[in-house]
Amino acid sequence: MNVLVINCGSSSLKYQLIDMDTENALATGLVERIGLEGANLTQKSEGKDKYEIVEPMKDHQDAIRLVLGALIDEKHGVIKSLDEINAIGHRVVHGGEKYAESALVTEEVMKDLEECAKLAPLHNPANIIGINACKALMPNVPMVVVFDTAFHQTMPEKAFVYALPYELYEKEHIRKYGFHGTSHKYVSAKIAEAMGKNIEDLKIITCHLGNGASIAAIKNGKCVDTTMGFTPLEGLVMGTRCGNIDPAVVTYLIDELGYTSQEVNTLMNKKSGIFGVSGVSSDFRDVEAAADKGSKEAQIALDLFRNSVKKYIGAYIAEMNGCDVIVFTAGVGENSIIERGAICRDLEFLGIELDEERNNIRAKVAEISKEGSRIKLFVVPTNEELMIAQDTVSIVSK
């Protein structure tokens, strides 16, 4: 069975065609600048040259038409006919409170997605456009939506309700939702498998540390808390996002410094975090290099990030009344020996003991804790596309 996984952004589209018999990606591609000058598609597949197309694409339907063409291209394609695509899985950022798991695309589901669009105005509209484009081009192929928020719907009220008037939650659905759920779900299942344990017997802290970053507390296979909130802005210090901040800073920026609400939104989402504090970059490698050369701001930025991760690890150990394993995943979590080392330093009193030699690895499933460490430490590469494909197979097979 072949599943096409699609992740639509406002002017971009990522895709993978996955053979679910082997769970290998037959092709991986990216379409950029949809609706803009210089629109292009790049596709990679094993044993074939990289395929690049520069061609005008007025909308996502044009983009998906090109994707389908690339997949069956005589020279660069990986399948002979579109009939070999058995299902399509769409990443959707926000499923609101209604969806605690993935769902088959129906008229009712599409209406719900439209309603959730106000909760994720930067993402859900693009996701919806992608689904409609696929429906127009491949009307007979079953489609599934996989939500970033779904995995976190098991959180209890004490974790997701904000201490605002309760009617704002009841009427306006203002609450913590959490994001990166597909990644947290994937790596928590993978670590249970790697340890040879039943996930229902484990207390797991998953650290998805990339340009966007979040941590989840997973007890007996269910998420009980996570760092991102009503939007992906809450929680950790991130590449360009500020993370937790006194909400009164927002009103101060508007009332005293003359910012508009949109300017504050842009400031906190795109100009803050590691990038804003360091003044260098949102790329940890660049900021680490600047800190090594004596940049005070770069060092402060790194310290803020590391401290925010440490604080949540401590909090989640308390919240779950213990922890069996901490998992590092995503770009920084999988690849940064420096950041993992700095985060785990001085946590021995909690039973967290990093092995410096074992930590000298990148992007593979590996234990990095010392023998005898009470809380195990692991690196587990995430694979959100495979998780989406697995959910898609599970739903269409029902």
From Swiss-Prot:
Function: Catalyzes the formation of acetyl phosphate from acetate and ATP. Can also catalyze the reverse reaction.
Residues marked Transition state stabilizer (site): H180, R241
Subunit details: Homodimer.
Protein's name according to its UniProt entry: Acetate kinase 2
Keyword field contains Transferase: yes
Signal peptide range: none
GO BP annotations, alphabetical order: acetate metabolic process; acetyl-CoA biosynthetic process
Active-site annotation: D148 (proton donor/acceptor)
Species of origin: Clostridium perfringens (strain 13 / Type A)
GO cellular component: cytoplasm
Record-stated family: Belongs to the acetokinase family.
Pathways per UniProt: Metabolic intermediate biosynthesis; acetyl-CoA biosynthesis; acetyl-CoA from acetate: step 1/2
Keywords: ATP-binding, Cytoplasm, Kinase, Magnesium, Metal-binding, Nucleotide-binding, Transferase
Superkingdom of origin organism: Bacteria
Cofactor note as given: Mg(2+). Can also accept Mn(2+).
Residues reported to bind substrate: R91
EC number in record: 2.7.2.1
